[in-house]
Amino acid sequence: SCGAWEACFYDGASTRVDTRELLQALTQEDNRFRVTFGAENCGIAGNTNAALTMATGEFVALCDHDDLLAPDAVRCILEAAQDGADFVYTDEDKVSADGTHFFEPHLKPDFAPDSLRSGNYICHITAASRALMNAVGGLRPGFDGSQAHDLALRLSENATKITHIPRILYHW
């Protein structure tokens, strides 16, 4: 529902031919898909940071390989950014492998620092202004496995305006 987006992929030396072929096909079909094929797997933080360096937008959102966004997710996030948010998160749920059944909704509270310090209720989808992401240094190597929580803590500590969109816009 929004044409102003790009998807940046960093392939961390995947040995799967079908993955490489799919990524190459995406870039040929639509120039909003950008791919770099890395010579090595740099871990979750390193691979994500490599993808972040490819992004040209003023706002960036982090997604995993198995994520599905609602059709209006990008538009909703951009509207929050236009309203002054520099850190945005949404509600989420899980989706069946065939993409037909949605279950286990995670309806999150508005920003609650003490709750975030206790555990990562924010998870995905997380989006931030490029300026804020750059200010906190992106994801930190050495935090793979808890990288999303570490990033959410640092983004929230440095954000000017945090916005929770109380809609399920992210499925995994």
Language-model segments: residues:
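Glycine-rich, basic loop-to-helix element that forms the pyrophosphate-binding segment
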Residues: G38-A55
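Short aromatic/hydrophobic "clamp" motif used to bind/position activated sugar donors
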Residues: V60
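Conserved nucleotide-sugar donor-binding catalytic segment
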Residues: P113-W172
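Conserved donor NDP-sugar-binding/catalytic core segment of glycosyltransferases
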Residues: L68, D72-F102, A131, W172
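Conserved short acidic donor-positioning loop in nucleotide-sugar-dependent glycosyltransferases
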Residues: Y10-S14, C42, H65
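Acidic donor-binding segment of Leloir-type glycosyltransferases
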Residues: C2-F37
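Hydrophobic/aromatic residue at the end of a short beta strand that borders the catalytic acidic motif
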Residues: I44, C63, L68-A73, K94, ...
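A recurrent flexible, glycine/aromatic-enriched loop bordering the glycosyltransferase active site
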Residues: A45, T53, V95, H101-A131
